[in-house]
């Protein structure tokens, strides 16, 4: 493969649509290969903006505004890194010959829970929990009654756990309805899911380069309010369950097609595997790979996009812990205890320009046996504060 220098007439360009902490790591990997990076987001000084050659601030759901930037920059690869973007812009760009990663249809399916659930369950016939779609509170009450309690209620379009809740009884329905309606994204339709009585859930990072598919070791994770707070790798599971998880991950990613890394979320009950969701981009729980693998999920994503070999070394077990802001501040300062910087631990600061309560600002990473690493990560993250 031929490489060139950035900011030249023959440079190879990638455009990140979404410039958060995950996009920032992808941008850094692209810089290491001499690619020219254009980072786009809805707000100024997003994390990837500081490591890109050029950046833009735009309404990410404005089709014409996005297309104007794409046509101006003429990127070789367009990498959607968030869900709240204009899918019409991606389809039009793809029709014009631009390379959308993994492809516009895959992005369209995965950004909408109705599309991906019906595709997975009814087209690919993957095992899932029971579900219904509703558009009114009355329909929600009826669906919850049929599916039983507890049940999980989510907008068909939202990101990072926004708008999700668990209704444990009929008395929770009103609150769940309001939570869903306040979510960023499209809350005009909700998915109601029967609660899967799973033992644990995993992320199966799956990379495709057009010639091969590779899997990272399964990642266990802990969520609060639908958002990741801790992850560890590998998740201990039976060989049968692991093989079934890889088979399911391959089936869904083959069905979506294209190149890149996918975060496939699965529920595990004994040796049984249930499909939950899939993201066609690096996954927040996969930040643990920054310390466990020779090629992180971000490096693998870029390699897959470029069609490069996907071999990597799993260095060993580890864990990650997300730090979420405890205050609101327009110029946040993060206080990190020196104990986080050891021979087997470190911290990554995302450089977000503004903090608000619950916003993810940093991640602590620990290299050790998974159980000990997770315990240490829990301890270390308490030594990070913001003001």
Curated annotation (Swiss-Prot):
GO biological process, any: 'de novo' IMP biosynthetic process
Pfam families hit by this protein: ATP-grasp, PurT_C, RS_preATP-grasp-like
Binding site for N(1)-(5-phospho-beta-D-ribosyl)glycinamide: 21-22, 81, 284, 352, 359-360
Residues annotated for ATP binding in this entry: 113, 154, 159-164, 193-196, 201
Alphabetized InterPro entries for the sequence: ATP-grasp (IPR011761), ATP-grasp_carboxylate-amine (IPR003135), ATP_grasp_subdomain_1 (IPR013815), PreATP-grasp_dom_sf (IPR016185), PurT (IPR005862), PurT/PurK_preATP-grasp (IPR054350), PurT_C (IPR048740), Rudment_hybrid_motif (IPR011054)
This enzyme's EC code(s): 6.3.1.21
Pathway(s) the chain acts in: Purine metabolism; IMP biosynthesis via de novo pathway; N(2)-formyl-N(1)-(5-phospho-D-ribosyl)glycinamide from N(1)-(5-phospho-D-ribosyl)glycinamide (formate route): step 1/1
Cellular-component GO terms for this entry: cytosol
Keyword terms: ATP-binding, Ligase, Magnesium, Metal-binding, Nucleotide-binding, Purine biosynthesis
The UniProt record lists the keyword Acyltransferase: no
Domain ATP-grasp: 118-306
Catalytic activity entry: N(1)-(5-phospho-beta-D-ribosyl)glycinamide + formate + ATP = N(2)-formyl-N(1)-(5-phospho-beta-D-ribosyl)glycinamide + ADP + phosphate + H(+)
Molecular function GO labels: ATP binding; magnesium ion binding; phosphoribosylglycinamide formyltransferase 2 activity; phosphoribosylglycinamide formyltransferase activity
Binding site for Mg(2+): 265, 277
Oligomer and partners: Homodimer.
Family under the similarity heading: Belongs to the PurK/PurT family.
HAMAP family for this protein: PurT
Function: Involved in the de novo purine biosynthesis. Catalyzes the transfer of formate to 5-phospho-ribosyl-glycinamide (GAR), producing 5-phospho-ribosyl-N-formylglycinamide (FGAR). Formate is provided by PurU via hydrolysis of 10-formyl-tetrahydrofolate.
Record protein name field: Formate-dependent phosphoribosylglycinamide formyltransferase
Gene: purT
